Curated annotation (Swiss-Prot):
InterPro entries xrefs: CofD, CofD-like_dom_sf, FbiA/CofD
Listed name of the protein: Phosphoenolpyruvate transferase
Organism: Mycobacterium sp. (strain KMS)
Catalysed reaction equations from the record: enolpyruvoyl-2-diphospho-5'-guanosine + 7,8-didemethyl-8-hydroxy-5-deazariboflavin = dehydro coenzyme F420-0 + GMP + H(+)
Assembly description: Homodimer.
Residue ranges the record marks as coiled coil: none
Biological process per Gene Ontology, one example term: F420-0 metabolic process
CC cofactor: Mg(2+)
Length: 331
């Protein structure tokens, strides 16, 4: 079976672990999952968080997925490298290098240095990511949504000048923690971007396409902003099943509620599902999974309530199983 997942953020990476657990891939590899009929997992990963910082290209969501699936993630933070040290950050601070609100760990810095060297040599991000994954063996194909620049920027009211200005998503997220007056999001460069090699084929050839319970605005929304992806979703023969990131009116991780409020969408499973919309209309969903005890009425979308707490890979695998079942696909 071929499974393609649109994903971003820490929660999305943990969702991929559940997919692997169900399919017997990666660190959960089983003998019965090997051979010519082995399952295949492809992740189309958000690049809207990507930025140049300290002279290196940082791709937070790609790295979080790679480290998580490769066993190198910091288990407490859910992002960054396991057993990290911070000597480079301390030295940069001693030199007074800006920005002082963003830090890179020493081990993580090595990843960014390799990536930046390859990008400057002319390799596209998709090939760079493939090369980095050779070290981590993530047990899945990780594809950036695009090789082109497509960055999420945020229009805020500057707390110091009281004037509107646009800042990179990383500054809004890390420096301000989304606690400044926020007016809109813009996916800078997305209109001129193209999908990375393999992305539309992964969607077209899939037996099922899953939307991870990632941030609907700045993770999944950023992916959908790239021309060609929404069209691929609408035309694939695979069923598209989404997972609500909202439980009891709140996201479990991140700031999806703040992002949703900016675009005028309520922090409910039903509102997010309606935001994605039914594929039978102008949207992208065939099915929508909400947390047990929750409900949603979305015309043209089959809704099912199941446990959506990703407490461990085995529990998350049951979430994935429910989505595959809703799609009518047999493992």
């Amino acid at each position: 079976m071929k499974v393609t997942v649109l994903v971003g953020g820490v929660g999305g990476a943990r969702f991929l672990l559940g997919v692997q657990h169900l399919l017997g891939l990666g660190q959960f590899a089983r003998d019965d999952a090997r051979g010519p009929d082995a399952h295949e997992l492809t992740a189309v990963v958000n690049v809207g968080d990507d930025t140049w910082m300290f002279g290196v290209r940082i791709c937070p969501d790609l790295d979080t997925c790679m480290y998580t699936l490769g066993g190198g993630i910091d288990p407490d933070r859910g992002w960054g490298h396991r057993d990290e040290t911070w000597h480079a950050k301390e030295e940069l601070a001693a030199y007074g290098v800006q920005p002082d609100w963003f830090g890179l760990g020493d081990r993580d810095l090595a990843t960014h240095l390799v990536r930046s060297q390859m990008l400057r040599a002319g390799y596209p991000l998709s090939q760079v990511t493939e090369a980095l994954c050779d070290r981590w063996n993530p047990g899945a194909r990780l594809l950036p949504a695009s090789d082109d620049r497509s960055e999420t920027h945020v229009v805020i009211t500057d707390p110091d000048t009281d004037e509107r200005r646009a800042i990179h998503f990383q500054e809004w997220w890390v420096r301000y923690r989304a606690k400044v007056p926020t007016h809109s999001f813009a996916f800078v460069g997305a209109d001129k971007a193209t999908t990375a090699p393999g992305v539309t084929d992964a969607i077209a050839d899939a037996d099922v396409v899953l939307l991870a319970p990632s941030n609907p605005v700045v993770s999944i929304g950023s992916i959908l902003a790239i021309p060609g992806i929404r069209g691929a979703l609408r035309s694939t023969s695979a069923k598209i099943i989404g997972y609500s990131p909202i439980i009891a009116g709140k996201p479990l991780r991140g700031m999806a509620d703040e992002c949703l409020s900016v675009i005028g969408v309520a922090s409910t499973s039903e509102a997010v599902g309606r935001h994605y919309g039914a594929r039978s209309g102008t949207g992208i969903l065939d099915g929508w999974l909400v947390h047990e005890g929750d409900s949603a009425q979305i015309d043209g979308v089959q809704v099912e309530a199941v446990p959506l707490l990703m407490t461990d890979p085995a529990t998350t695998a049951e979430m994935v199983r429910a989505g595959v079942r809703l799609a009518g696909v047999t493992l």
